[in-house]
Each structure stands twice: as C-alpha cells, then as structure tokens.
C-alpha cells in the first residue's frame, strides 16, 4: 500500500459511543508483557558506534554498511485470537454499511509494538553475530550479496587474506541493522554482510520477489548495503578513515537556517510558537551528541521548556538569545571540522584537578595521572565585593551562594589546567570538588537554580568545545579529605596557621608538608589578573561575549622554583587524606594507617572507574578492540 494512503490506527484515542459510554483506550488497558531488554539496547546504538570508532587504531580503516527492514511492524503477526483488540471501524460515507477491519499484525500506535518488534530485531542481530563467528567463507551465498560491493575502498582490498583478525560490531536500531568492520580482505566484508542478511531472514523470512523482501531492496539500490568508509548512521555522517562524525549535512543546514530565522525574528520583536521551539531544541540537543560541551549552552532553553509559554520571545530574554546565538555558532563551525569520536569517549584520566573555594578565595592542585605535567598548586583571593556579597546566615541578602563560588573555583581550575597541561585535545580529565551542587551541575552541564552557575556552565561548555577535550569526569571529594586544596583557598588570613604572605611561602609549605616523590618540587602558578577578572566578572553578573571566552589571555605565571613534569601522582595524594592521629590516642599504629590507606586507594579507584563506566554504553557481545577502564598497574 502506498505510504500516502496508508492509515495508522491511533490506539491512544478514547472513543465515545452514541449511548454516551467511553471505551477504554487500548493502550491504557494493555498489560505490558513484551521483553524490555531490547529497548534498553535501543538507546545505546549510537553510543556503541561512537565508542567503537574511538577504540579503533589510527592506522585502520573502518568500513560501514546498513540494512533496513521494510514494513517491519506489519511482519509481526498477532497471537491467534488477540487481533480483535486492534479491530476498528473503517471510515465510510453516511449510509454505507459498517465495515470492520481486523488487523493481524502489530500496529504502529500500540504501546507494546516497539518492544515486541525490537525483541525480534535484537534476536536477528544475535543470530547474525553467531553467523559472523563461523569461518570466513563458510556461509551459503546470499541473493543480496552483490549489493555489498562497489565502493572504491572496497575494491582496493585484497580478495582474501589469511592473516589479520576480523574485527566487527553489529548494531540494530528498531528496523535499521548496521555493521562496522575493520577488514583485511573483501572476503571478510562479504562474510559479515552475508551473516547479517542471513540472520535477518532467519527471523523475517525471505520473499521470492525481491521487491517484497523484508530487507529493503529499495535501500540497497541506493547503496546503503555497500561497504564504504563513509556512511550516514543514525543521522550522523561517519568517516572511517579519520574516525570522525558530524550531523548529517542536510539536517545541519536545516537547523542552522531555523536558528538564523529565530535570531532575525528577535530583531523584529517577533516570537515563535512554543511547539516549534520545543521540537527544534530537541534536534539541537541531538546534534550536540557530536559536539563536546554543547549541552552546557542550553540551560536558558531548559528553563523555558519547563515554563512552556505559548509563544517564545527572544528579544525579551537576553540569556536565551545568547544561548541560541552560541549554539548556531558552534554548529556552523562544525561544518569545517567534524568531531573526532575519541573526543566523545570518557576514560581513565590523563590529568586530575582538585579545587576548593571559600568566601575568602579559591585554591587548587593539578597533577598528572596517565600523562605528565608539572605538579602545580594555585590560589586566588576574591576581591572584597565578592566576599561581602556571599550569602550566609550573617548575610542573608547576599546574591552569591557558596555553590556559586565553588563552581567559579572549578572554572578557574579548568583555565589553569589549560595552561599547565596543554595541549588538552582528546585528553581525559577528572575534576574533584567537595561541593555536591558543583559536581552535579558539571555532570549534567546544566543548572536550574542559579543564574551565576548557569553562566559558569556556559563558560565550561565553550572551553571544552575549543579544547576538544574528552567528556569530563567530575567527582565529589569529602571535605575532610580535601586539605591539600583547603589550605591554599584559606591562605589569605582567615586561618592563621595557613596564612601565606607570598607565593614563595605557599611553595615552601607544600614542599615541606606534601613532599613529592623523587625529590621533585611543586610549582606555584599564579592566575593572571586578566584571567581572574573574567571569572570574577561572572560572579558579578557582568555580561561577556562569546569571543571574550574563546580568546583568552595567558592564564597563569609560574612563581619561584619550577618542578619537573611527572605522572601517576593521584594515588600518592591519597596518603595525605589518612589522619595521623585521633583524639584520645597518641597516634595510629602504622599497620592501621597503611590498611586505611589501602582501603582509600581501592575506594577512590572504584569511584573513578564507576564514573567512567556510567558514561559508556551498555555492554554488548562483539569482536572489537576495547580499552579497559582501569589502567594496568
């Protein structure tokens, strides 16, 4: 049946009979019994592909192909006797006989259709995976095998190769089957394609007429089943040579046009319907899948989505106008530089930063973990107007919360890490803070409760995007374990024992009390006044433009003795979190202190590993190179 004339039954529609009785909705009366596991994998498909690209070696080529199930729901038969639940009256002209339609297949509008159908396609995917594991060349010829060939890169491969392991991953998203392969021969690609198509036909039987086959011949004729190093998968264009991805060109151009029209409407004092705003922002959010930090620009949009006004006016909402303008700029720039998939995957940190802020100042330390950097400590005293404006019991009228200060401190930590650890492209960073709201805001790259924090999140989003850094691991550190940064943040006179009149005094204290391995020295890096002014301006809610945050002055200047770049210091820092004495006793026994230190190391390793694991997709059986989360000890 032609799509233009195909009817879709709305099973979420309540029906009122002539006698006034209302029939219960089919969806409301449905007892949900379909397997849910298939839907769990549904939302992981794109992430699985991104992670696979990120794990591949630089010198490999990734080939991609995809297959579409034609009229998928209509190929799933109802259990005998259950089809009457979908029956409906065919619309007729007045006076015509009543005609009942009794569908025998799954209906598009039924709440259980997606999980039942996805269970079938996931089963086909698992069968295909088993076929892939058979010896290359052992599967019977498939009638659609000819559609695999033709791409330039395919023709450049040798026909067969006895050396080289076959790496492949299979994904399915509703009715779209996708395979990514690192082959050493044409034979390997043909084997994987045959395995997938055979697996599909084991669940959705083949048709003698190719045009009616479950595997869409129309899509195959368009080249979708042809293995190539360039392919559009789930709305994104992937490059198997450079391991990059970017929003499909047509979708990106349409988004840019819409956002531009919104900004023009603002200049004309016009509004746009809320429905359009909601729909387009959802597409922008999806586009930001391929743009590091992009979500951090959407806080003003999130606030409006919660209010749901009938009309959205940009000229009345400066933060919203700025957010849309920033989003359009980042999307436009992505046209000339696709995102490397490695920029989108978290992992064990190359560098670690720990920060603390008080009403007096901010202090932090920066150390190398998997990569080397100068072990660095920094501090910055807040100006008097900031200290005086901090909200507290003694100052309930203050407009800056402690959490705002902590997030501002974390932004300063990040800017200092850009200076100390550069370059940060494709590096993995862990940031520790003892403030729970700060950790939550950075994890979500969004804030609902503070306009100051909202602007600070925007700053981080812009800087993450510029640096092309991997997803940030943000973790909470207990306050009583954060003395290494408590000290510099309170070193301006509020704590007499930690009052350092100069950066040289701070350096001496750290080298004496936090002695580095191998007689190395700490480096004290002083934030420049220009970079400090930018951070403080956000606390003052002074407007800054996109360029103000994209083109930064030098962030810091080293003071006094400079240490040597080193790595693997994070576990060493944990030795300064175990107390050396308890009230009521002279000291810990050495064995007890060592035991507590070992427990703390294990717990903190687990904390980072769990945080990284949460940013990874659900596990799935595949033959693809994978980097373990925990580094080899």
Segments from the language model and where they lie:
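Catalytic-core region of right-hand nucleic acid polymerases
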Residues: 1-128, 246, 253-301, 305
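Metal-dependent nuclease catalytic cores in nucleic-acid-processing enzymes
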Residues: 43-56, 122-126, 400-426, 457-468
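A short, polar/acidic, helix/strand-boundary loop motif
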Residues: 97-120, 152-153, 370-408, 429, ...
């Amino acid at each position: 049946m032609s799509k233009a004339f195909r009817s879709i039954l709305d099973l979420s529609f309540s029906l009122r009979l002539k006698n006034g009785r209302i029939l219960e909705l089919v969806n409301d009366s449905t007892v949900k019994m379909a397997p849910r596991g298939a839907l769990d994998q549904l939302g992981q498909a794109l992430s699985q592909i991104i992670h696979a690209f990120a794990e591949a070696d630089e010198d490999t080529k990734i080939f991609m192909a995809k297959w579409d199930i034609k009229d998928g729901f209509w190929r799933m038969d109802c259990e005998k006797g259950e089809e009457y639940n979908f029956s409906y009256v065919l619309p007729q002209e007045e006076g015509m006989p009543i005609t009942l339609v009794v569908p025998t297949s799954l209906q598009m509008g039924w709440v259980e259709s997606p999980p039942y159908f996805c269970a079938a396609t996931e089963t086909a995917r698992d069968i295909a995976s088993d076929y892939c594991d058979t010896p290359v060349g052992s599967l019977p010829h498939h009638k659609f095998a000819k559609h695999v060939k033709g791409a330039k890169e395919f023709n450049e491969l040798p026909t067969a190769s006895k050396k080289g392991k076959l790496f492949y991953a299979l994904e399915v998203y509703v009715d779209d089957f996708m395979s990514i392969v690192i082959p050493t021969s044409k034979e390997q690609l043909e084997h994987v394609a045959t395995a997938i198509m055979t697996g599909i036909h084991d669940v959705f039987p083949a048709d003698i007429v190719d045009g009616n086959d479950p595997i869409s011949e129309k899509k195959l004729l368009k080249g979708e089943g042809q293995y190539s190093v360039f392919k559009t998968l789930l709305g994104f264009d992937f490059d198997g040579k450079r391991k990059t991805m970017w929003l499909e060109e047509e979708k990106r151009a349409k988004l840019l046009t819409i956002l531009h029209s919104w900004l023009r409407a603002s200049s004309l004092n016009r509004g746009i319907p809320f429905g359009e705003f909601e729909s387009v922002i959802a597409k922008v959010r999806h586009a930001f899948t391929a743009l590091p930090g992009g979500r951090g620009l959407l806080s003003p949009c999130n606030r409006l989505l919660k209010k749901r006004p009938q009309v959205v006016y940009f000229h009345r909402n400066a933060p919203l106008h700025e957010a849309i303008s920033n989003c359009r700029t980042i999307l436009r720039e992505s046209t000339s530089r696709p995102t490397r998939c490695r920029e989108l995957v978290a992992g064990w940190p190359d560098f670690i930063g720990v920060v603390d802020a008080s009403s007096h100042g901010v202090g932090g330390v920066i150390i190398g973990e998997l990569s080397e950097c100068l072990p660095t400590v920094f501090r910055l005293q807040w100006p008097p107007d900031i200290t005086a404006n901090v909200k507290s019991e003694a100052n309930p009228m203050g407009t800056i919360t402690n959490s705002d200060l902590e997030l501002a401190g974390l932004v300063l930590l990040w800017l200092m890490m850009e200076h100390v650890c550069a370059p940060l492209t494709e590096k993995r960073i862990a940031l520790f803070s003892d403030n729970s709201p700060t950790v939550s805001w950075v994890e979500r790259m969004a804030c609902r409760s503070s306009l100051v924090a909202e602007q600070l999140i925007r700053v981080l989003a812009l800087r993450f995007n510029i640096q092309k850094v991997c997803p940030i691991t943000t973790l909470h550190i207990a306050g009583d374990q954060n003395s290494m940064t408590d000290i510099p943040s309170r070193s301006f006179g509020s704590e007499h024992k930690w009052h350092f009149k100069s950066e040289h005094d701070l350096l001496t204290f750290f080298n004496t009390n936090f002695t580095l391995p191998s007689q190395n020295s700490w480096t004290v890096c002083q934030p420049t006044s220009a970079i400090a002014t930018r951070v403080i301006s956000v606390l003052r809610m002074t407007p800054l433009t996109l360029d103000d945050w994209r083109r930064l002055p030098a962030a810091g200047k080293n003071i006094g003795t400079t240490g040597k770049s080193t790595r693997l210091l994070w576990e060493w820092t944990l030795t300064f979190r175990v107390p050396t004495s308890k009230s009521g006793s002279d000291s810990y026994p050495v064995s007890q202190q060592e035991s507590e230190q070992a427990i703390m190391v294990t717990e903190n390793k687990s904390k980072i590993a769990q945080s990284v694991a949460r940013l990874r997709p659900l596990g799935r059986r595949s033959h693809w190179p994978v980097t373990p989360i925990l580094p080899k000890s």
